[in-house]
Structures are given as C-alpha cells and as structure tokens.
Amino acid sequence: MLEKLKERVKNWMQKTGAETGLSKEFKDIFEVGGVPAFNQFYYFGIFIWKYLYKGFYSPWHRILAPTIENPRNRRDLERMDVAKAVSSELAGLIWSEQCEVHVSQSDSEEQPLEEFVHDVLTKNGFWTKMQEHIEQVLALGGGAIKAWYEVKRDSAGNEIPESGGIRLGFCMADQFVPTAWDNAQVTDGVFISREAKDGYYYTRLEWHKWDGLTYYISNEAFRTEYKQPNPGMTEAQDILGFRYPLNEIYPFLNENTSMQGLTTSLFAYYRTAAANNIDDNSPLGVSIYANALSTLKALDICYDSFIREFRLGKKRIIVPAQCIRTIIDPQTGEMRRYFDASDEAYEALSTDSPDSLKIQDNSIELRVDEHERAINAFLSILCLQVGFSAGTFTFDRATGLKTATEVISENSKTYKTIKGHQLQVKMAIAKIIDAIVQIASLYDMKWNGYSIKALASRGWETKVVFDDSILQDRQTNINEGILLIGNGLMSKKRFMVEKLGYTEEEAVQELVEIEKESSISADMVDMAEQAGQEANAINPNEEPEAKEEDEEAAEDES
C-alpha cells in the first residue's frame, strides 16, 4: 500500500513539474545520470553522418547565392546522395537473403532448436530487415538489435492467451548509447525511442544493465513540446524535456524488471570494421565515410555545378531594348512586337550607342566532359577512402552513378572490406540468437512439443554462413578444395566447414553418410561380380551357343 502511494506521489510530481516547467528540463540524454559523456561524438559525428545519409546537411547544402534582387539569397545545393549509395551498395554485398543461420546441438537430422530460432527470425522479418539495418550501421558507424518477450492485448488491455512471442528491434546508432563495455563487447546500454502525440514528443529510455548475475531492464519517460524541425540540423525531438509518468504513455510497461539465469545481454551492438580514429576510448564505431567527408562535399559541389551548367548555359539572344517595345501598326492599328516577349531565349539590353543596336547570339559552350572527369576523379578517391576497389563507382552522363558488378577476387580491396564487416555481423547474429534462446527458456516457451528450456540445457552451436556467390566463383572454391584434399593438404571436414558452410556436427554427419554410401556401393559391386561368376559356372557354353545361333540367322537372311 505504501509503495503504491509513493508511486502516485512521484507520478503527480513528475506530471506537475512537466506541465508547469518547475522540474529540471533535460536538453539531451547526456545530461541524464549514468550516461557517458559521448555528446561530442554524437553531435559532431553520428548526427552529421545521419544527415548526409538522409541526403541533406544544412551547413553544406544550403549555400549563399546572391542575386541582384536579393544579395542574401540562399539556395539548396543539388546533391548526388553518394553517402546513401555507398552504404547501400556495400550492405548488399555484405548481406544476402541466401545467408544461412545454423543452430546445431547434435549430429541428428532433427534440429528443433534451429527450427524454433528460424521461426522467430522469419516472423520478425529478419532476412529482409537485416540488410536495411546493415546499411544504416555502415552509414552511422554502429547499431543494435534487441530481443524481448511480448504478449498481445485486446482493445480493453487484457492479455490474449497463447499470444506471447519473441520480438526483435533494430536500432540505429543515434537510438542507442552504450553505458558499459569491455574489450570484447558492449554489455550495458540505453535505448532511445520517440513518438509524437497531441503536440508533444514523448521519449522513452530503456536501460539494460548487469548487477552481478542479475540483469535489469528499467524504463523512464520524458516529454517536450512539439517544435517545427530544422532540416539538416539538430532536430527538435532530440531534446528530452521533462520527466513524465511512464504509465501515462505506456500503461502496460513495467518500470523495473529483473531477470536471473541469463548469461548474455538481451541485445547485440555491432559496429563497422573500421577503427575509431575520432575517439579511441569509445566502443562506438565510425561511419564508412567518416574520413571521406571532404570528398563527399566536393562531389556535391561538382554535381551541383554540372546541373547548373545546363540551367545557366541555356541559349540567350541579346537584342536591343528598343526592339522589344510594342509599336502600333499604322495600317491595322494593332499592337505588335518584333520579337516574342514570352520566349525566354531573348534578353533585352538597353544602350545609347548606335553600334550596339544589333542582335547577338550569346550561347555558352557546355563543359560536360570537364564535369564528368572531375566527378569520376572524386569517385575514385572515395573508393579508396571507404574500402572499395578502384573503379567500383563511376559517373556517366547518360546513366548517372554506376556500380561495377564484376566477380571480386579474394585479393581485391572490396572483398577484404566485405569480409571484415561480415565478421562483425556474424558475432552480432550469434549473440542475438543466444538472447532468443535464453528468453525462450526464461518464459518456458514450447515448440512442436519440445521445451526450449530443456533443449537449451543441452547447449548449442551457432554458425552464420554468407552466400559469397556474388563475391567470388563458388565452383573455383570447390575445385580448389578438391585439389587440396586430393594432395592431402586439407581434411574433408575442414573443407566442408570453411568452404561449404557446414557446422562441425553437420560435417561429421555428412562424412558418415558418405562413408555408408561408399560402403554400400562397394558391396553392391562385389555382389554383382559374384553373381556373374556363379552364372558362368552354371552354364559356361551359353554365350558360344548364342553366338552360333546369331551366325546361322545371318546365313539364312543372306
């Protein structure tokens, strides 16, 4: 009873403080206690990368363009959106829906735990959503995937029986702040989620932290007034505002939850493979184009000049101002002009000199080739800076930005970059699968009659295999493996694990099956030979008699 009273008093004070403005207003999450001081890295790193990824960063793309009419006129730069294109292209090479996730427990054919994990991943759209998330991670330097158990409710708020399931959330770098980490991984963190409602922005902070062997999840809410966003700059919803009662916005969400028996955090933070050369004490990653900002800016300037070359270089015919005045035809009495006043090709020039009273074609030669060469030069520099092989991106006047799609050799820079990022993705997937299994065990979930808790007690091995067919020739890998095995330089098991994507257990099981088939084939050959020998022993003259009969038939025909 006393706890409920305290809760009501706290909620009343928070709500009153937010409505009257008497309580403390938080400008951003870094003013909240327990959050590391990463504000410089977020404001001058992640937020800038985010605006470039979205295609508009105000300090770059809103420039001064003075005119005679308005010396302070500003305009928006034409943009190539290369940051988005580079992130999208690399994400497509890293991830494919052909990616395989194996969760094996033994050498048996049935793998119920793997089937359960695949069902959870499929229901959450993991196979298609993951490529989008990798693209965002590459652009912003990092991101997180979190797992939780959720029960559906009806319109009255009542829980629907047998509706519980595991959900996955994909968070961008600006929606997550790590609060504890070691050399291997981020262990604690806070997730930031926002929504707009009734003229206010509501922000929920979801804290994940360890205290000994106990895992805690806590939630708190903040409210700030809705303000018109300023594109390309810090957005209004980035301001937290005042603390607000959680149950006013999320009535079915617990403020504090503790869990025992977990061995891993219920989220997986992963970053780009590039080293953080901006803040080497931070566990956060950097964007793939973090060190190519000047090149991205130069590309937008060149592209803007290329577009304006056609706009400013349009055909102009300079005519004397006297020639475009209206005159009255003495014969008809109608108003007439010597030139079409609605034709934008004509520009009037007023002059007092009789020598200047002549029509001049003032057309400008377009510098298309020069712009094309300049853009391609900067694209070559960009490929070097983001880890692509030279010539991966090119610009063509007819088709615009193009991407090379040739098969990539193992020695190419692009291939090495892809494999480095794939390693980060593999570790994140393995960790989130561990979280899925542990949540299912905690809530004693069932799958096709199996208890996930009982299955998990036997242990499991997770293996993520990427489809490298878009990177290299699969047949080349197979031929190379056959050559190494034939010369005794590689075991069959190792070849199946490293090149064909088998887990250790699957490789052993497959080798046993191959040995059985080989044994059966050898026995069948021996049986066939033995049967033939027995038949010859019973009737040794059968073949010669048949031969004589064939010769007699041939003589009769002749």
Region locations from a protein language model:
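Extended, non-catalytic structural segments that build the interaction scaffolds
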Residues: G45-I46, Y51-S58, R62-L77, S350-Q385, ...
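Short amphipathic alpha-helical segments
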Residues: E109-L113, T122-M130, V137, N291, ...
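Short, basic interhelical loop/turn and adjoining N-cap
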Residues: L500-Q509
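Extended, helix-rich architectural segments
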Residues: M1-K197, A546-S558
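Extended, regular secondary-structure scaffolds
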Residues: Q131-L140, A144-V286
